[in-house]
Curated annotation (Swiss-Prot):
Domain Glutaredoxin: 215-325
InterPro entries on file: Glutaredoxin, Thioredoxin-like_sf
Domain of life of the source: Eukaryota
Gene3D superfamilies found in the cross-reference section: Glutaredoxin
UniProt name for this protein: Uncharacterized protein At5g39865
UniProt cross-references to SUPFAM superfamilies, sorted A to Z: Thioredoxin-like (SSF52833)
Length: 390
């Protein structure tokens, strides 16, 4: 009648209700039937909704039954459209039956996996740690040292009982002979070396070494002079520092012992150099480094030493100088005590240049008490290295 459509709406054949996609709920529910498993059990029905599926813990016996009902839950409704044709749709009223079936299959598999995982975890036995935590009770063991030392004697069977040991050497005790025979007494003397085989017991050192040999050896030892090098280790002036390094390399290559005196580490060396060169310079003014001396004889500076080395005269001048032994500091080896610095901190004041004298102490030569200047080190609290600067 009027402008309204008089065409009847599609109705469901089962419930005779109108089909409208607007009023269809988004969640679905299903009925799961649980038959009686034991005598006396009742037949009951459980309604499952989409929000509860996945949160229930199922036992292994009802797993297959639940999966079967999930497949049967897709009941189909026949809907007649305006043309009179019937269409099969799923239970929620929409035309997406395949997607909902896939979702339910996935949920069933997830539930089945959870059930199997929980079952496996229950069957796996828990391993208990076998390491003991508490110390077992018991009395401490007593060790008898006398039993362990039994059989060990002070005298070894491989060593004579008359063998004595000193701190630095071994010797054998010789039993005194009660026989007055001279030949037997001589047989107990220490063995002589080959050098003394043909020498009489009454000979003296003067008979072996003539006096002229001893005097020549003493004169040769005392007559050796050292090469004294005055230099600086400061790098403020680059040319001066490089000249000092070059002269040190030239002198060390000759294998002689050098008395290196660093004027930057000890002001006393600077005063010595001024006193030695006051005749060559204007009262020691304008002295440059390095400077080389052979004893008290002045050899020259950097230019003179280079020229003497190139001409071969430097090696002739120092032929009587003391040579450096192999492996000792100065022969290409660094001093282990000072590291080729030639100075070490003072052992008395530890480099502080101060000593404290208490009034109660009665030291010889101490007239004042309190903090005093250390008399053993220089102005920098350093002393000469006792290893390489003997």
């Amino acid at each position: 009648m009027g402008c309204a459509s008089s065409k009847n709406r599609n109705r469901c054949r089962n419930c005779k209700g109108g089909l409208s996609p607007v009023i269809v709920p988004r969640s679905y529910s299903m009925h799961v039937h649980h038959p009686a498993q034991h005598t006396g059990d009742s037949y009951h029905t459980v309604a499952l909704t989409s929000s509860t599926i996945g949160s229930l813990s199922l036992c292994d016996s009802s797993l297959r039954h639940f999966h079967k009902h999930l497949e049967d839950s897709f009941y189909k409704q026949r809907v007649s459209d305006q043309m009179g044709e019937e269409t099969l749709i799923s239970g929620n009223g929409f035309l997406h039956g395949d997607e909902e079936k896939m979702n339910l299959d996935l949920q069933a598999k997830v539930i089945e996996a959870k059930v199997w995982s929980s079952t496996i975890n229950e069957k796996i036995p828990k391993i208990v740690a076998k390491t003991p935590i508490v110390t077992p009770p018991g009395e401490p063991e007593t060790i008898n040292t006398w039993e362990l030392m039994e059989g060990l004697e002070d005298v070894s069977p491989l060593r004579s009982p008359n063998h004595l040991r000193s701190f630095s050497f071994d010797f054998v005790r010789i039993q005194p002979s009660h026989d007055h025979d001279h030949d037997v007494a001589v047989s107990f003397d220490l063995p002589k070396s080959r050098f003394h085989e043909n020498v009489k017991s009454s000979c003296r050192v003067d008979d072996l070494d003539p006096p002229d040999i001893v005097s020549r050896f003493k004169r040769k030892t005392l007559g050796k002079e050292r090469v004294v090098l005055y230099f600086t280790s400061l790098r403020g002036i680059r040319k001066t520092y490089e000249d000092c390094c070059n002269i040190r390399i030239i002198l060390k290559s000759l294998g002689i012992r050098i008395d290196e005196r660093d004027v930057s580490m000890h002001s006393g060396f600077k005063d010595e150099l001024k006193k030695l060169l006051e005749g060559k310079f204007n009262n020691g003014v304008g002295i440059t480094l390095p400077r080389v001396f052979l004893g008290n004889k002045y050899l020259g500076g950097v230019e003179e030493i280079k020229k003497l080395n190139e001409n071969g005269e430097l090696e002739k001048l120092i032929k009587d100088c003391e040579m450096v032994e192999d492996g000792s500091p100065g022969f290409g080896n660094e001093c282990e005590a000072c590291g080729d610095v030639r100075f070490v901190p003072c052992e008395t004041c530890s480099g502080s240049c101060k000593l404290y004298h208490e009034g109660e102490e009665e030291d010889e030569g101490v007239t004042e008490y309190g903090f005093q200047r250390c008399p053993y080190c220089n102005e920098n609290g350093l002393i000469r290295c006792h290893v390489c600067c003997e």
